[in-house]
Design a protein with these regions (language model features):
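Compositionally biased, low-complexity repeat tracts
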Residues: 14, 22, 27-28, 78, ...
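Short, solvent-exposed mixed-charge patches
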Residues: 219-220
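A beta-rich soluble binding module of mature secreted/lumenal proteins
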Residues: 10-12, 93-97
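Short, low-complexity polar/charged micro-motifs in intrinsically disordered terminal tails
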Residues: 215-216
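Short polar/acidic secondary-structure junctions
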Residues: 21-23, 36, 49-51, 107, ...
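Short amphipathic beta-strand and strand-loop transition segments with alternating hydrophobic
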Residues: 17-21, 99-108, 165-167
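Gly/Pro-enriched, hydrophobic low-complexity segments
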Residues: 34, 45, 57-61, 67-71, ...
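N-terminal mature ectodomain segment of secretory-pathway/periplasmic proteins
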Residues: 1-64
Length: 220
């Protein structure tokens, strides 16, 4: 589920189902919105290539227009379906595009000791693509897993606060079943979004046809 919370604490919930498949050249993912009716059958398809010189590909299908829109590099900093998460947040970043430094060797988050790592984009192109100037991430030392983030947004002098909760090991993989992103300005909350995973399974056989543009239009 994706829960959107405005500054007056009014909530809207969107149900979705997603699939991800590792292929020889990278990772393919597709998500289908199930409800409410205004977003039902909207779908998002992304290809994240292992080759850092190759741009990732992603598309959004809007059933009301019966149209599939390609998400270009300049659009990846845009909001995903009205949420505080961007397309770039969903697709992830190229590690090689940033310089890193440990700004704090020890900080405790939810009882777990963490490193605090600062990531700075190496180029203006990366800033344009992500919309972010700098990111602080709290990484748990015991499981090498990100649990908290503070993101400096390029536009509007805003700061995003990210957190990962309900962290479980499922089929040998560490997963945050709840992720929240909050947009703030002058330390005041403007909007929040929460991704909640109800059920998750790994190592399932998925047909390649599920990750093609035709599948977006067929819906789930």
């Amino acid at each position: 589920a994706l829960v959107l919370i405005d500054k007056k604490n009014r909530k809207r919930e969107r149900k979705l189902k997603g699939f991800t498949k590792e292929v020889s050249t990278g990772t393919k993912s597709i998500s289908f919105f199930l409800s409410p009716s205004d977003v039902k059958n909207t779908s998002y398809l992304s290809y994240n290539w292992d080759d850092p010189s190759k741009d990732n590909d992603s598309w959004l299908y809007l059933p009301s227009l019966q149209k599939t829109n390609r998400i270009s590099g300049g659009d990846r900093s845009n909001s995903f379906m009205g949420s505080d998460f961007t397309y770039a947040d969903l697709d992830g970043v190229e590690i090689e595009d940033y310089t890193y430094k440990i700004v704090k060797d020890s900080d405790v988050v939810d009882g777990a000791d963490c490193w605090v790592i600062e990531a700075t984009p190496k180029s203006k192109d990366v800033i344009k693509e992500t919309g972010y100037l700098k990111t602080l991430t709290w990484i748990r030392k015991d499981i090498f897993f990100g649990v908290k983030g503070r993101i400096l947004v390029k536009k509007g002098k805003k700061v995003k606060l990210w957190s990962a909760k309900d962290i479980k090991k499922i089929d040998g993989v560490w997963v945050a079943k709840t992720q929240q992103m909050t947009t703030t300005k002058k330390k005041k909350r403007e909007h929040s979004s929460i991704f909640i995973i109800d059920t998750i399974a790994f190592n399932k056989k998925l047909d390649d046809s599920l990750f093609e543009s035709e599948a977006m239009q067929r819906g789930y």
